[in-house]
Amino acid sequence: MLRYWGEIPIPSGQTNRSSFDLLPREFRLVEVHDPPLHQPSANKPKPPTMLDIPSEPCSLTIHTIQLIQHNRRLRSLIATAQTQSQQQTEGVKAEESEPLPSCPGSPPLPDDLQPLDCKNPNAPFQIRHSDPESDFYRGKGEPVTELSWHSCRQLLYQAVATILAHTGFECANESVLETLTDVAHEYCLKFTKLLRFAVDREALLGQTPFPDVMEQVFHEVGIGSVLSLQKFWQHRIKDYHTYMLQISKQLSEEYERIVNPEKATEDTKPVKIKEEPVSDITFPVSEELEADLASGDQSLPIGVLGAQSERFPSNLEVEASPQAPSAEVNASPLWNLAHVKMEPQESEEGNVSAHGVLGSDVFEEPMSGMSEAGLPQSPDDSDSSYGSHSTDSLMGSSPVFNQRCRKRMRKI
């Protein structure tokens, strides 16, 4: 059998197989796995829980955390008290329910609410520049304490736990604390690297575009000015502590009102209002106004009809009516209808100046009489409108109705 150089010998027991025989008989889906979480602290030994150096936490922050826990407990007590009162209203006996506990006391206020380096409350977190001639500025004096990696990790872990408790979280898993500690560790590394580059650049060039290298690094990482730390201390730490004190006081008072409602009613005294004598103010009434009230306008207020001089201006001449005048009756706008035929009553045929009564011919009259060419003429072939038999009514005396009638007469 001819063999080539480098040819792999085929065992005698193995038969020739095609490429299709090498394919798998059943196709299986490949399982997708998430990429593993990058946690820098996973490959390093876990530091012990006890700190190598004593920590000095801020008393203001610790007291704020205690107030948050106290407020959480007060809210649970208030919810329990409200549930019991609701059950009593529904018919559950008071003996079956457990007695409400007394209001727990607020955590004591620490004596030193400010850190050791921040005793002045008027200027908290004040920035002080070191004296260039001092030993600290020259790097002389006591040696600086160097922290090991385990000590830094422990302090950072405790700081992250304090921040979460100050924010309002009651509990957290250890894996969450480890992950957030790694995030804070990476942020600190980035900050210190930028600070190292800025210091070297300032030493090389002899100047920096910012007032200080620390100010430059603060802008590069996105914090802003160095004064933003002072604003954060004032608003997020001090003002938040004052707000928690107010909330604790309000919740304590609310729980006391629920537990002791009788005491709450005794404490609330009624507000006394000093009574002063009130004198009646009299307004003089003119003689002309009394004369108008004596006329037929007494049925409506003065503000509706107006005075006699306001209803009939001096420059408007009222046409004389051949019939008996009755201005007091027909002057009311409530009885004046523009296109309604007015007929006298049967008992007052002689005096047609009284109020007209609607007759049946008003509704039986065809609409062809109301053409657009003009209005129908009055029965006595006068030029006045067909609205009323009395020309001294409001329709004849009012300038509004007079102008409209004369305008239509010009069209005719």
Swiss-Prot record:
Annotated spans, Disordered: 81-107, 364-412
Ranges of Low complexity compositional bias? 384-393
Q: What are its GO cellular component terms?
A: nucleoplasm; SAGA complex
Specify the signal sequence span. Answer: none
**Where does it reside?**
Nucleus
Q: Give the principal location in a single coarse category.
A: nucleus
Assembly notes: Component of the STAGA transcription coactivator-HAT complex, at least composed of SUPT3H, SUPT7L, GCN5L2, TAF5L, TAF6L, TADA3L, TAD1L, TAF10, TAF12 and TAF9.
- Supply the name of the protein: STAGA complex 65 subunit gamma
Identify the species of origin. Mus musculus
Q: What is the lineage of its organism?
A: Eukaryota, Metazoa, Chordata, Craniata, Vertebrata
